[in-house]
Amino acid sequence: MQKGKVRNMFSGGNTSKGFFSRFDHIMSREDARRIFVIKGGPGTGKGTFMRNISEIMTDRRYDTEHIHCSSDSKSLDALVIPELKVALLDGTAPHVIDPKVPGAVDEIINLGEYWCDSALAEKRDEIMKVSDEIRVYFQRAYRYLKAAWHIYEDSSTMYGSAMDKVRLNSIAGEFTAMLFDVFPPAGKPGRQRCLFASAITPDGLVSYVDDLMTLDNIYVFEGFPGSGTDIVLERIKTAAVERGFDVEAFYCGFDPDKLEHLIIPEINTGFSTAGKYHSTDACANKRVDFRELLDDSAISKLGPELEY
């Protein structure tokens, strides 16, 4: 018997702005039939609990979404069963969540009820010491990421200064016309679900882009930071939402304000950015190389700074 499909993604990330959470976008309470908020400390089995439920549901041919933890990509922060409008969320730090519509929508599952207090009490000092060390190392890692962002921003600005903005606007116009010209603006805008397709983790960069790009129509934008891929994606996203289409917007795991991938489920269409750190092996309907929009003479003058 065919099993349900599993989609993988992240709702939070270790970014240049520190830990950045989009937990509120996992499932809106307006849509949800039930949201289970799971409490309990590290190691209490929250991720295993969600994986076991996912396995049971996929065996019953339900599709599921695995929302992975950026601090441990093998663990889950949440599980979504879209057809049933049910979500299970890890409600502990760094994304502490409490029921907003208790009883009617939200319900707490406290796995902390099943730990052995006496055994943990014996390890009290060791647990506190390790927790403090983890906090210090995370803070240090975020300082490094913030420092790297300034170099990234400088390079992006230089590439942006050499970009042909007329051609960039033309590309944005071509895609919005191709996709949406037959659709008038809607009375009610579409909704945006904002998450991450990749994350910086203790195992390095983990990406689920290929896992998400399983649509009939896929367009790949190739380019450097600053070459305008995100600008065109934002234009397409805005046009889709204005016409009433719901979208899934996946942002950069390093720069959480930069749009990298876009899915418009209703028209079975996806856009993916391909660069140095991530690309998709999906069969694309069309690839657009944004590096061709850069002025070669301007880039050559910036060469020493960019190489640095």
Residue locations for each model-derived region?
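Short secondary-structure boundary/capping segments within folded domains
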Residues: M27-S28, A78
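Extended intrinsically disordered terminal tails
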Residues: Q2, D24, C69, E153-A162, ...
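N-terminal pre-Walker A segment at the start of P-loop NTPase domains
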Residues: M1-M27, V166-D210
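An accessory alpha-helical subdomain
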Residues: E126-L179, Y308
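N-terminal low-complexity, Ser/Thr/acidic repeat segments characteristic of secreted
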Residues: R34, P184-K188, N217
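Glycine-rich phosphate-binding P-loop
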Residues: I35-S54, D203-V206, T214-A240
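Conserved nucleotide-sensing/catalytic segment adjacent to the nucleotide-binding pocket
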Residues: Q2-F20, E55-A119, D125-E126, A240-Y308
